[in-house]
Amino acid sequence: MRTENTATLNLMWGALILEELARLGVQHVCMAPGSRSTPLTLAAAKQTKLKRHLHFDERGLGFMALGLAKASSAPVAIITTSGTAVANLYPAIVEAWLTHVPLIVLSGDRPPELLGCGANQAIVQPAIFANYAQQVNLPTPDAHIAPQMLLTTLDEAVANQTRPVHINCMYREPLYPSELTATILDSESPYLKPLQTWLQQARPYTIYGKREQLSHPSEDAIMRFVHGKGVIIAGTLTPEQDPQQLIALSQKIGWPLLTDAQSQLRQHPAAIGNIDQLLQHPKARNLLQEADRVLVFGGRLLSKRLIAYLAEQNWHSYWQVLPQQDRLDPSHNAKHIWHANAAQFAQLNWYRSSSANWANTLITYNDDLHHLFVRNIDQGEFGEAQVIRAIANTRPLEQQLFIGNSLPVRLYDMYAPVSCCTATTYTNRGASGIDGLLATACGIAAHQGKPTSLIIGDLSQLHDLNSFAIARSLTSPLVIIILNNDGGNIFNLLPVPNEELRSDYYRLSHGLEFGYAAAMFNLPYNQVDNLADFQTCYNEALDFQGASVIEVTVSQHQASEQIAALNLWVKQS
């Protein structure tokens, strides 16, 4: 029988869920409006331990949660109503699963008797995320189900979790209590009597021990591993892994450190950051082919040339270091995968290689490319690579950088400048989609309030126009730099059979500008077509307490023609 008690118990379960998630380390909850999720929404509204973020579009909401989780290194909860609202989270959940980002989806759902019978807004929600989330299906709230069961279910699903969890929450009507009391979890409630101790504490009901993070080789194995010519590769690494320790490791062993755009070390002067270009430099490539052992930190490398190098080289020893058990080696050459924090592994008792400094000439080649890029990009024609290098050199210690997919992140990987300091860098390179990039950047910016720059292509921004609504709510600097080359011009770099096919089926020129979109959301907007204007607008935007848009207008072929010219110079070096 549906009574006021149903609404009260629904709300109590919602409050238990939100309270336990807060105790499990959740700091942020992202919410979209909807009726069936009312018990969760009202509980979140009363929960003082969580920072609330609201958005009307679940796709953008999911990506905002992804950004918050990346920036906070903590799980983030997402509340949605039933039906396609849940399905709209799928792209963000896929990205989070592939990159080990813990998102906790709390989806409101119809009770069992309203499923599969034509009831409104009712779909099969359990397992909707298939391979990309751990699934928990909660029953409808019932006074005969002990509240301890609810808490232990949450604890087992969420504790130590590094990937998405989907908690499906069925609720019967009525969903709205006649009044909202000051305290939902009232210790005087008979239903909560078994939780008296828990209510007086601040810890989870069940505490799970931390999983052992570090596996490491023996000293003898290390001695044998470093006995020869080797390279160290820094792939995707989070700031929490303290990638700077890899610089010290490289210097101790005497092997070069080759750095990916996502390593936090791409611009470090002691690293070989221009590895993508060096692998088409004849002398550098010949030298690198002498290596017979490799130590890879992280995975998901950007450079196809570096990926091919790892696949084609005849390695005597191939070690990879990952923070969790995973398979992130498309070459299938890795023979030992160690589960450890990068910094911890780098601080083991390493020995100097018997072939220390074998590749020191790479430093000269890397420096030569640095000077080439200064002459031909910084001092050359206005374009996308020039803007990206200018961003990377502007106030790096003051800000964080989110680099969009497709062409922007590749240009950064190929041509980022050498710098004494680097902004903390984020990407979405799990599934490498061009959706949700602005929303992710908004989440990153919202966590600490640190100035944030987003570099995004025009098609990516068209995908995520709704997230301008999230951006306008920010109170810290978010500079949205849209590189508008009128279409998907990364396809200029790919062997499409002819120009007509490229234009009609791949590039999809649109002729659109973003000024009216920015105005619709009341965001400051500038359009630039030269470096001086860009730098003026960019520095002003970094000081503006909120989001702003800089649209960089470039020709369709500027980047691809510049890349071709630089490739030719490098190959002839």
Curated annotation (Swiss-Prot):
NCBIfam families: menD (TIGR00173). Belongs to the TPP enzyme family. MenD subfamily. Its EC number is 2.2.1.9. The gene is menD. This is 2-succinyl-5-enolpyruvyl-6-hydroxy-3-cyclohexene-1-carboxylate synthase. SUPFAM superfamilies: DHS-like NAD/FAD-binding domain, Thiamin diphosphate-binding fold (THDP-binding). Pathway: Quinol/quinone metabolism; 1,4-dihydroxy-2-naphthoate biosynthesis; 1,4-dihydroxy-2-naphthoate from chorismate: step 2/7; Quinol/quinone metabolism; menaquinone biosynthesis. It holds the Pfam family TPP_enzyme_C. It comes from Shewanella oneidensis (strain ATCC 700550 / JCM 31522 / CIP 106686 / LMG 19005 / NCIMB 14063 / MR-1). One of its GO terms (biological process) is menaquinone biosynthetic process. Homodimer. GO terms for molecular function: 2-succinyl-5-enolpyruvyl-6-hydroxy-3-cyclohexene-1-carboxylic-acid synthase activity; magnesium ion binding; manganese ion binding; thiamine pyrophosphate binding. Keywords: Magnesium, Manganese, Menaquinone biosynthesis, Metal-binding, Thiamine pyrophosphate, Transferase. Catalyzes the thiamine diphosphate-dependent decarboxylation of 2-oxoglutarate and the subsequent addition of the resulting succinic semialdehyde-thiamine pyrophosphate anion to isochorismate to yield 2-succinyl-5-enolpyruvyl-6-hydroxy-3-cyclohexene-1-carboxylate (SEPHCHC). Binds 1 thiamine pyrophosphate per subunit. Its cofactor is Mg(2+); Mn(2+); thiamine diphosphate. It catalyses: isochorismate + 2-oxoglutarate + H(+) = 5-enolpyruvoyl-6-hydroxy-2-succinyl-cyclohex-3-ene-1-carboxylate + CO2.
